[in-house]
Amino acid sequence: MLMNKPLVLVTWLDAKDGQTGWHSIEDIQKERLATCHSTGWLMYKDETKIIIMADYSEFDDDKEGGRHITIPSGWVQNITYLKEDDKEKQNEHG
């Protein structure tokens, strides 16, 4: 099943909580987003979201995935295709 799914590194932005306690308004206004890096098989991609899955298991006839994440497309900064032959699939997935 996964032979046709590209292995990718996704760089994306996420919300970041501030520390508890009192802080100056100036310091609060300087807060930044967290930059995240996630790897896995690119399972789905459209204009609103991408889904990557990090783990895959086969046992008898069961095929299951784990550690998947759905990321809003607007949060994605970059998608790097990790295997040379997957770079050709880049055009298929955006």
Positions of predicted regions on the chain:
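Conserved RNA-binding domains used in RNP assembly and mRNA/RNA metabolism
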Residues: L2-G94
